[in-house]
């Protein structure tokens, strides 16, 4: 029979405090079964502030990423287990492995068809002692928060310091860090692959029937993955139709394997009939068919 695949997704969080309050709030979540924190709200406030300061200092374009979030879908059998225990186990597994702070919540969607964990984690760790930088001479910052070399660069024609610019006098603190820099491993594809393996294994630990075990989806396999339909997705009908076509292909691939057709042959058909045709169609119509 066709393997069931685990679903684990990662998101970037530009507003970690807002996201924490959203996933952990009974008022905003219809089916919230448990929440778990490894650090208090002061930690997250400080993290958000320092991330924004660092981002401003770097002068990088785009959005500041304050933290990241994993979404882990759990098989329906998990609804029979004690929610707080499940959430604690899954969150502590992450903290033990990566040594970072987390906040998590266990939810069901509205129709109670998708039992899942939201796990927010910090990419920075607290320093043993705050790193405080004291100005050995006057330090100047322009309107964007960028450090400049001379007072002249932030002085208007009237001889006054321009609005929004700052001067830190000698002996004053001009920068302080409570956290390390971001751990870059969380950005990479290898991390997502690893965490999918880790959580798929953990999910399977609590499922006694091997037939029900989940597998990490292998994009080089004969099967096509289903697409997830998010809340209030305007393309819901399109995605449902697309998923039905994918299931049809997966059933056909199953039948072909059972009838003795080699995996290599099926992969060849998948490549020519699906991937190549889809990319031609995308080039000509700009549609996402796969």
Language-model segments: which ranges?
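N-terminal nicking endonuclease/strand-transfer module with a His-rich metal-binding environment
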Residues: 1-290
């Amino acid at each position: 029979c066709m393997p069931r695949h685990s679903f684990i997704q990662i998101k970037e969080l530009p507003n970690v405090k807002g996201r924490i309050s959203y996933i952990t709030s009974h008022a905003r979540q219809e089916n919230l079964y448990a929440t778990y924190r490894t650090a208090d709200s002061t930690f997250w406030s400080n993290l958000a502030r320092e991330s924004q300061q660092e981002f401003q200092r770097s002068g990088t374009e785009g959005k500041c990423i304050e933290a990241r979030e994993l979404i882990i879908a759990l098989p329906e059998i998990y609804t029979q287990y004690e929610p707080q225990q499940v959430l604690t186990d899954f969150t502590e597994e992450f903290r033990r492995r990566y040594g970072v702070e987390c906040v998590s919540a266990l939810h069901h969607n509205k129709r109670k068809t998708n039992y899942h964990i939201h796990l927010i984690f910090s990419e920075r760790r607290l320093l043993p002692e705050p790193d405080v930088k004291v100005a050995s001479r006057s330090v100047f910052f322009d309107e964007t928060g960028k450090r400049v070399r001379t007072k002249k660069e932030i002085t208007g024609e009237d001889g006054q310091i321009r609005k929004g610019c700052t001067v830190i006098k000698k002996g004053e603190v001009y920068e302080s860090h409570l956290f390390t820099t971001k751990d870059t491993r969380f950005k990479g594809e290898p991390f997502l692959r690893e965490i999918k393996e880790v959580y798929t294994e953990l999910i399977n630990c609590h499922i006694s029937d091997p037939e029900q075990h989940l597998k990490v989806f292998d994009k080089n396999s004969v099967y096509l993955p289903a697409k997830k339909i998010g809340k209030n997705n305007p393309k819901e009908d399109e995605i449902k139709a697309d998923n039905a076509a994918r299931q049809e292909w997966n059933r056909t691939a199953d039948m072909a394997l059972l009838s003795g057709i080699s995996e290599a042959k099926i992969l060849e058909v998948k490549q020519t009939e699906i991937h190549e045709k889809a990319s031609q169609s995308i080039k000509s119509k700009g549609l996402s068919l796969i």
